[in-house]
Amino acid sequence: MAASLPLPASGLFRTYGAAGGGRPRRRQGLAAVQWFPPQDRKRFFSSSSSDTSSGGPSQSVVSDDPDDPDFPGSPVGQRRRRAGARLAKGRPSQIATPRRLRLRSRCPQKCSTPCGALEPPSFPNGNPGSLSPDLRVCGQPRDGGELGTSASLFSSLASPGPGFPAPEDSICTDPSTFLDAASEAPSNFHLPEASLDQAPLPCSQDAATGGGRFTRLAHQAQASLRSALFSFLDPGNPEDSELGTDGKNLQEFCHDRELVGRRLESPGLSGRGKKRTTDQDSCREIESQESVQIEYEEARGCKGGIASGKSNGPERTRLSRKRKHQGTAETSLLHHCQVTKGQKMEDGSCVTQDLTRLQNACSWTKTRASFSFHKKKIVTAVSEVCSCDTLAGSLSESLMSEYSHHPVQNRTSCALSPWHSSSMYLLTPLKTQQVTDKRTSDAEKLYGECNQVGPIPFSDYLSEEKLECCEKIGEGVFGEVFQTVTNHTPVALKIIAIEGQNLVNGAHQKTFEEILPEIIISKELSLLSDEACNRTEGFIGLNSVHCVQGSYPPLLLQAWDHYHSTKGSANDRPDFFREDQLFIVLEFEFGGIDLEQMRKKLSSIATAKSILHQITASLAVAEASLHFEHRDLHWGNVLLKKTSLKELHYTLNGKKSSIPTRGLQVNIIDYTLSRLERDGIVVFCDISRDEDLFMGQGDYQFEIYRLMRKENNNCWGEYHPYNNVLWLHYLTDKILNQMTFKSKHNTPALKRMKKQIQHFYQTMLNFSSATDLLCQHSLFK
């Protein structure tokens, strides 16, 4: 039996990757299966069940998919049954992973793929729940298991994580090699910290009632249990499919989950029955059980077991008022239960480990689809978001710049064509509308955005000439991304299946209602390039949207096959769609290569300064125009492309300015978690109960999620532009600590510029918004 694989690294939130693996299994017509917990709760705490080829503990995501890269544990023998228990009929035996498999070339991994390092990131201060003041903690390990954020150029259409997908992506290219971390940030600077605590109670309409409070406590208990239990879940054979390769394990799968689902109703999770773990691992099992018990009691309001203390926010030099509803933050004990196994690997199991890494990376996108990462946007009126009392006590209220208070402008003249004018009015909630009428209304709105009266055939939109030059360049749970040429200009086509019954890459297809906000958000930010009062070209351009019908064109399937044979695909081959299947095709401009892949390719630190300047200006314009927060601006969502322009121009509140390009233009993508507002309508993604998103470790990206939650007190409908500052701080950290430049800092000008960026890094958290930074900070003077 092959040796167990190590515990996973921090699972970073991504939509797709270029990792290859075993050929994806096609599951035509597979209906969604209701979630049921597995039967044997002893599997929750088996220390051998948490092993994988990645290098550190991961509690960012929970999964019931045996292909989950966070939990592809060691081969498992037949499960012992308890005395008096009935033996399930027709239960197939589990087969151990073969010791040797044929060698396959390893596809390059992006540092956001959950694989690599064989140990969890070290925390010099001894507290795994927070980041060390030393900025080098955020660096990447040297063995290829980097813990950077998602490098995807496109994100799937619905999710928080990282997120859910959004249709605002562009072109993806091959990933670059991994980078050895080099920390050059000031040693005396303290990173902002937000403890791995329970979330503040999410703001909702039931908050004022006793029933609402009970509901929130129940949700917290469920989230805590889910995160703890499935972090230690034994998935069995990592090569098996979600319900068995041939579907024969479906009955056992659902039966096991149903039994454990009943047991989880009570807090009595302490071990009963025989143990499957070794003596060496039994103490870890008991510790894990006690942690889950404490988490359960904490969610129910039980006293004792957890020491409470106030979590510290970013350090400011100015005064700020205390939050009215500031509560104590309790550090979760789940993160103290993380362990790694130093088992010796035989020569033959190295091949298995390499192959499993590829399979794990490919299944990561399907994992996200199974656990609340693909939610629809919430559309509501400004007056219905959380109370202004919470906003008044936010971390940054006392620092709000005068530029942040300008009302959202009525920006676009209604005399323009529909595609060149705002469509936010289409999202106005109609509470009195019937369900059937609403679906028809949503379809009509979408067809209106497409300038169609109904779906058109694939061939009417994609001519034979366009199809012949199509090349697949990216993918996600949402679907596929192809590059083609339109009017002698390269464009990216994002193809998303909608309104169908079949699962697509493990996720339900979106409806007209769910896809419409994604389209309109991309359109609103793209339209900022045409505005007068607040103008920027820093957001990816959306050229057109079409709704097509039919099966996948053969030439696109050929492009899909070529991508799979050269890079490896995590998606199912899209050949199972019927003739009546609907697709949304979003045509984006060419966006370039993401910052993560360019981390070794930039010419000098001066180029990095231009990148920071362009991103800050784009966010500032979006703040002034749309009260915009990106909320997931990791370096995989920053695209760079070459430009011959010496300067880029933007307009903020009527004032025109320019930025030196240094030969590169920045495009921001992926509005999955974003929040924007216009004409009294707010569109946002409510992640208040997605506890797994806030429990990641090993990268500064995870700390940003927690700091955002602390800033807005877990009310995600509110406007808090300070969240944009937090993401700019994250990007500056990446530039200083994890990027290398072709030209070293050997000239006085470059040395002076590096010191300016270091000063920017040290002082930027004292500013209230991207607008405040752009107008007031010395780096941009």
Curated annotation (Swiss-Prot):
Keyword Secreted: no
Biased segments, Basic and acidic residues type: 276-287
SMART domains given in the database record: DUF3635, S_TKc
PTM annotation (Phosphoserine): residues: 58, 93, 132
Major location (coarse): nucleus
Entry GO terms, CC: centrosome; chromosome; cytoplasm; nucleus; spindle
Sample GO molecular function, one term: protein serine kinase activity
Catalytic reaction equation(s): L-seryl-[protein] + ATP = O-phospho-L-seryl-[protein] + ADP + H(+); L-threonyl-[protein] + ATP = O-phospho-L-threonyl-[protein] + ADP + H(+)
The entry's keywords: ATP-binding, Cell cycle, Chromatin regulator, Chromosome, Cytoplasm, Cytoskeleton, Kinase, Magnesium, Nucleotide-binding, Nucleus, Phosphoprotein, Serine/threonine-protein kinase, Transferase
Pfam families (UniProt xref): Haspin_kinase
Binding annotation for ATP: 473-481, 494, 589-594, 632-637, 670-672
Top-level class of the enzyme under EC nomenclature: transferase
Signal peptide: none
Cofactor: Mg(2+)
Biased composition (Low complexity): 46-63
One GO process term, biological-process aspect: protein localization to chromosome, centromeric region
Its biological purpose: Serine/threonine-protein kinase that phosphorylates histone H3 at 'Thr-3' (H3T3ph) during mitosis. May act through H3T3ph to both position and modulate activation of AURKB and other components of the chromosomal passenger complex (CPC) at centromeres to ensure proper chromatid cohesion, metaphase alignment and normal progression through the cell cycle.
Family: Belongs to the protein kinase superfamily. Ser/Thr protein kinase family. Haspin subfamily.
The protein's name in its UniProt record: Serine/threonine-protein kinase haspin
Organism: Bos taurus (Bovine)
